[in-house]
């Protein structure tokens, strides 16, 4: 199953590189390219006719290429979703908010039953979701997350955490209120990392304890 994730990750990296080439191409023509891919495609659609003909051809080819890549990613997500539905470990993981089929399959493929980690904090640290420490004025302080370990798994957990934040804004249940208060207290990105790290710890517990793990007792 890891081959599926490695190939999917390669498609994602290629997609990012293609969009960056597109940004660079239109920037050479004096057009400021937005970072958002949706905004970039909208802007290109609106302004393409004002670009030189050769640039227009390159833009069309790059967009066609990225469309094929996105179709491949979608197909791999379908395959991984089917696998997740037949794997009891993945099914348990998907009960966590922010953990979908792709993330669940990736965790199972990479860390199995999580027995190589003593606890959930160790897994979160291995994934680079814990803040670095440094000394200033004789005091120990926390810095940015280390971003160590498996970047693919970390990215999936962070993306899942972002979806949790988006969903929480529209709900009033206890968990959603906690998420919203976390954003207010710590800011958006710190809240995203905190939720991703919490999910990493819960994923460890689910994989380590198996059917003995009870989500409500951990959350």
Model-derived regions: residue spans:
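Non-catalytic, well-ordered alpha-helical scaffold segments
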Residues: 2-5, 9, 16-23, 56, ...
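Phosphate-backbone recognition surface of nucleic-acid-processing proteins
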Residues: 92-95, 101, 105-188
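Short helix-capping/linker segments at secondary-structure and domain boundaries
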Residues: 18-19, 73, 112-116, 162-172, ...
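Short, polar/charged, Gly/Pro-enriched helix-capping and turn/loop motifs at alpha-helix termini
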Residues: 25, 32, 83, 171, ...
């Amino acid at each position: 199953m890891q081959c599926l994730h490695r190939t999917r990750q390669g498609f994602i990296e290629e997609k990012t590189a293609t969009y960056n080439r597109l940004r660079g191409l239109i920037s050479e023509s004096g057009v400021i390219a937005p970072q958002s891919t949706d905004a970039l495609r909208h802007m290109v659609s609106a302004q393409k006719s004002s670009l030189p003909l050769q640039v227009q051809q390159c833009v069309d080819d790059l967009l066609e290429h990225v469309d094929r890549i996105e179709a491949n990613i979608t197909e791999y997500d379908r395959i991984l979703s089917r696998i997740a539905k037949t794997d009891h470990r993945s099914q348990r993981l998907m009960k966590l908010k922010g953990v979908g089929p792709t993330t669940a399959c990736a965790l199972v493929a990479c860390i199995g039953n999580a027995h190589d980690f003593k606890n959930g904090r160790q897994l979160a640290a291995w994934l680079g979701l814990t803040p670095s420490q440094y000394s200033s004025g004789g005091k120990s302080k926390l810095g940015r997350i280390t971003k160590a370990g498996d970047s693919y798994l970390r990215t999936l957990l962070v993306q899942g955490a972002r979806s949790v934040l988006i969903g929480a804004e529209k709900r009033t249940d206890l968990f959603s209120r906690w998420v919203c208060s976390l954003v207010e207290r710590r800011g958006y990105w710190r809240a995203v990392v905190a939720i991703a790290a919490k999910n990493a710890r819960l994923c460890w517990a689910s994989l380590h304890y198996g059917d003995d793990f009870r989500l409500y007792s951990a959350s």
